[in-house]
Amino acid sequence: MNRYTTIKQLGDGTYGSVLLGRSIESGELIAIKKMKRKFYSWEECMNLREVKSLKKLNHANIVKLKEVIRENDHLYFIFEYMKENLYQLIKERNKLFPESAIRNIMYQILQGLAFIHKHGFFHRDLKPENLLCMGPELVKIADFGLAREIRSRPPYTDYVSTRWYRAPEVLLRSTNYSSPIDVWAVGCIMAEVYTLRPLFPGASEIDTIFKICQVLGTPKKTDWPEGYQLSSAMNFIWPQCIPNNLKTLIPNASSEAIQLLRDLLQWDPKKRPTASQALRYPYFQIGHPLGISTQDSGKPQKDVQDKTGPPPYVKPAPPAQAPTKAHTLISSRPNQASQPHQHFVYPYKGEASRTEQLSHVQEGQPNPPFFPSLHNKNLPPKILAGLEQKSGDMKPKSRRRWGLISRSTKGSDDWADLADLDFSSSLTRIDVKNKKRQSDDPLCRFESVLDLKPSEPVGTGTSVSTQASSQRRDTPTLQSTAKQHYLKHSRYLPGINIRNGVLPNPGKDFLPSSSWSSSGLSGKSSGTVSVVSKITSVGSGSTSSTGLTGSYIPSFLKKEVGSVMQRVQLAPLAAPSPGYSSLKAVRPHPGRPFFHTQPRSTPGLIPRPPAVQPVHGRIDWSSKYPSRR
């Protein structure tokens, strides 16, 4: 022992005390276990179970016995030093462990335990104090003082292991037990690592059985006949309890963890899995490729492909029927979804190669390889021609066709083909907008603001706008229906600047004018500005653009406004004059209300200005046009 120096005492047990020491030669920290009783011969020392078992067990998850020293009739075991035990690690936690850390801890415990059982020993005293740690990353099984060989004959001592981790057969004083008692202790430790609390903290052996019954429920005689024999031998009467759901007791455990825990804590020791079987539970099966079974994960991908067969493909329709081709191309996704998915190795490659498989089949070539080359990226020209001819008919399904083209990994040269497939209607709309923006005809611009349609074509650009408006009505869009609803429910307040647009219904939400441009009506907003400029050029009075405020003076109170709000003679439709009176001459679209007066006061709207007497012989518009809901 002169080669080691002792630093401090780490713990004290039934059979010995543990000291922290350091090797003088290497400076390595060690744990020195000093046995309490004296040993007077080496033969007596070598017969110790701890020495016999640890000499045979060399595993990464079993604490390593470095040396055995007998000096002055005292026996010393030199172990590798571990920072703490699992009980200290649990006690110092102020929050729960993540499940990944718990899985790592339990995996190491079961690995070491499987090695112990494989070599013919079982521990008999597994508890958190006997699991040494270097943080949650490394766990090793220690303290083999109660270890027995499995092949040794019963009877065994009935008082083994700490009471909270004792298996039911040991609590019922069985003398014929074996390695399943270690598996039960692992289940108790697993629950404690999840909850940071012991699962069965009984004050006595009978109290521990009662606590086990409260969690697992009273076992039936058919489930564990040996247990009823042991209980009758002790004159023990089973408490009648119903089982609790382990998920409610351990809410932070996954379903795989609950499945493993339920099997580790079986009443009947024959029904508990062995340590090596527990390692094969789904709880520990992580990281294998998705879509491949664990049996096939070790095989090369070529074997998996041969087993599952070639990837599925869709045969295109005959070239004589171009529309049928387009439908077949679009509906290839639902057809494939109904087929059984046999493999999912690199699914994005399989998705990208569907159009290539179509071209391979059409040209009479064999099936493409499992990892297809990306040089043949163009769709067949006949299918493109069919789609180009029927682009108007396929308009409602444009989203699907767009998704299919985007999956085919097109190159930069192939994006020109997209204009033939789906953008004909949108390009026409953009053309019409540009023509409207460049048009100098104020009538067309005023009509674009109010969405009016004259009875006869006027000017050169009217036929184009009529065609575009009919196109818009044929295709139901959210934009046109929203604007029609908006204009049908509009009201007119005298003196409101037209720059603010038509006043919305007071009961509806207010739609700001800026949102029109964001919804694709930028051409219409420019028309509004031109009309406002002509209106302001006629009247010299200034109008407020902020709507109705507390200090607002209506424009009809001003003397300079003149005949803006008076009835005017309608001008002929064929030759509109640039003045404002010609703009007033446009008849509104039949069935659609024109400017109306404000209805009676509505809650939530700013109050109207006080009523005044008619000025300059103006007509009382509120009496002439009653309010209309």
Curated annotation (Swiss-Prot):
It catalyses: L-seryl-[protein] + ATP = O-phospho-L-seryl-[protein] + ADP + H(+); L-threonyl-[protein] + ATP = O-phospho-L-threonyl-[protein] + ADP + H(+). Autophosphorylated on serine and threonine residues. Phosphorylation at Thr-157 increases kinase activity. The modification Phosphothreonine is found at T157. Expressed in embryonic heart from day 11. Highly expressed in the uterus and at lower levels in brain, heart, lung, kidney, skeletal muscle, ovary and liver in adult tissues. It is found in: Cytoplasm; Cell projection, Cilium; Nucleus; Cytoplasm, Cytoskeleton, Cilium basal body. It comes from the Eukaryota. CDD domains: STKc_MAK_like. ATP binds at L10, G11, D12, G13, T14, Y15, G16, S17, V18, K33. GO terms for cellular component: ciliary basal body; ciliary base; ciliary tip; cilium; cytoplasm; nucleus. Gene3D superfamilies: Phosphorylase Kinase, domain 1, Transferase(Phosphotransferase) domain 1. Its cofactor is Mg(2+). The active site is at D125 (proton acceptor). The modification Phosphoserine is found at S161. Its EC number is 2.7.11.1. One of its GO terms (molecular function) is protein serine/threonine kinase activity. It is an enzyme of class 2 (transferase). Residues 460-482 have a biased composition (Polar residues). The modification Phosphotyrosine is found at Y159. Keywords: ATP-binding, Cell projection, Cilium biogenesis/degradation, Cytoplasm, Cytoskeleton, Developmental protein, Kinase, Magnesium, Metal-binding, Nucleotide-binding, Nucleus, Phosphoprotein, Serine/threonine-protein kinase, Transferase. Residues 309-321 have a biased composition (Pro residues). Pfam families: Pkinase (PF00069). Required for ciliogenesis, particularly in neuronal and retinal progenitor cells. Phosphorylates KIF3A. Involved in the control of ciliary length. Regulates the ciliary localization of SHH pathway components as well as the localization of IFT components at ciliary tips. May play a role in cardiac development. Regulates intraflagellar transport (IFT) speed and negatively regulates cilium length in a cAMP and mTORC1 signaling-dependent manner and this regulation requires its kinase activity. This is Serine/threonine-protein kinase ICK. It comes from Rattus norvegicus (Rat).
